[in-house]
């Protein structure tokens, strides 16, 4: 089973992901961007305010393709539980906001990006969405890069809402404004239900 953790920067995904290592020690834990050379290129692009939005999208997509073939698919084939800190929904939400705010002439960026992935990507079995207001997310994240600004995160949050509306049965929304301990406890409950424990 592939479980993904999604939400705005600052929502606590990584904190939850790290806490789950103790609860599911035999699971395969992974994240996007990865630590491969593709992921390193993504990190460089994210840090650059002048990165071309289409080039950045395709760097992220290349990292995802490599992640699928090198980590996700082999782990699933072995029957592992896979828990990923970010996955394709991050790309849909974030890069659609980036493209919409750019000079790139794409009418429906979210649908465009989903279309690129449809040919090769594997959707998650379930997605835990850590929901947090854009302003609070930006404050928590520290506003250290172009993806951590209030206005941008508000657009990203709207894209996440569109994704949830399109597939409500796949997403489980958790209020991330609670304490980290409360969020972690709720995620553990949700995972237990999803895994039939």
From Swiss-Prot:
It comes from the Archaea. The keyword Nucleotide-binding applies. Gene3D superfamilies: P-loop containing nucleotide triphosphate hydrolases. It is an enzyme of class 2 (transferase). ATP binds at residues 7-14. HAMAP family: Thymidylate_kinase. This is Probable thymidylate kinase. It comes from Halorubrum lacusprofundi (strain ATCC 49239 / DSM 5036 / JCM 8891 / ACAM 34).
């Amino acid at each position: 089973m592939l479980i993904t953790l999604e939400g705005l920067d600052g929502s606590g995904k990584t904190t939850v992901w790290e806490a789950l290592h103790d609860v599911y020690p035999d699971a395969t834990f992974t994240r996007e961007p990865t630590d491969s050379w593709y992921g390193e290129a993504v990190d460089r692009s994210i840090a650059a305010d002048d990165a071309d939005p289409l080039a950045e999208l395709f760097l992220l997509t290349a990292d995802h393709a490599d992640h699928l073939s090198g980590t996700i698919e082999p782990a699933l084939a072995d029957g592992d539980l896979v828990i990923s800190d970010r996955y394709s929904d991050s790309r849909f939400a974030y890069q659609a906001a980036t493209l919409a705010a750019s000079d790139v002439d794409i009418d429906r960026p979210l649908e465009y990006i989903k279309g690129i992935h449809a040919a090769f990507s594997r959707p998650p079995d379930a997605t835990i969405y850590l929901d947090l207001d854009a302003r609070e997310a930006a404050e928590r994240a520290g506003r250290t890069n172009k993806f951590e600004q209030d206005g941008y995160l508000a657009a990203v949050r709207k894209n996440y809402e569109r994704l949830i509306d399109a597939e409500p049965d796949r997403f489980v929304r958790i209020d991330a404004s609670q304490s980290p301990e409360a969020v972690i406890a709720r995620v553990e409950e949700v995972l237990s239900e999803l895994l039939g424990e």
